[in-house]
A protein has these predicted regions:
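Membrane-embedded alpha-helical bundles of multi-pass transporters/translocases
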Residues: 1-180
Length: 180
């Protein structure tokens, strides 16, 4: 999969369009669009099996899906800080950023642990070397962990963002904050 992950570099070119896109849509909507791309990527990658063209397409879509949340997530934190200021509370950008970083570390640790548990439960034996033949259950788990399981988490993010309403109020809040 090393060569396949190079295709995510192609998706990085979409970052050039982000400033223009943010003039027409909110940060939340751009992240939601990325979630949709990742969900589609997960389906494509799961169905691809050993089809290199589909794997390349899925990896490009995956990159296009992960970039918005990676790059635009901090902007949501700034919107929350603006909201705090609008409510008369301290902005707390540092605290919000630290919580975000801490949550990322905890999430990565839990995700890595669960990957190990699921791979072990599927019959994967990593210490057998190149001579081992992986059981079908381990191959299926690898496919699931690379495709549908992350896509399901992006679907959860997409659902949660439906309840994020600051994007509709942020321009008015920022104007009020500047007037104070």
């Amino acid at each position: 999969m090393g060569i396949m992950s190079l295709f995510t570099v192609v998706a990085m070119l979409t970052m050039i369009a982000y400033p223009a896109m943010l003039k027409k849509m909110s940060v939340k909507n751009l992240i939601q669009l990325g979630c949709v791309f990742y969900i589609v990527a997960g389906l494509v990658l799961f169905l691809a099996k050993d089809n290199m063209a589909l794997l390349a397409t899925g990896n490009i879509l995956m990159g296009m899906g992960t970039l918005p949340i990676s790059m635009m997530g901090p902007l949501l934190i700034i919107e929350c800080a603006d909201y705090n200021e609008w409510c008369g509370r301290p902005r707390m950008e540092g605290t919000l950023g630290s919580i975000n970083g801490f949550a990322n570390k905890i999430g990565s640790a839990i995700g890595t642990f669960l990957c190990g548990v699921l791979m072990a439960a599927s019959g994967y034996v990593g210490s057998a070397g190149d001579t081992a033949v992986l059981p079908d259950s381990a191959l299926m788990m690898i496919r699931l962990l690379y495709s549908l399981i992350p896509a399901a988490f992006f679907a959860v993010v997409l659902f949660c963002l439906k309840f994020y309403t600051l994007d509709k109020k942020i321009d008015g809040m920022r104007k009020e904050n500047e007037e104070r």
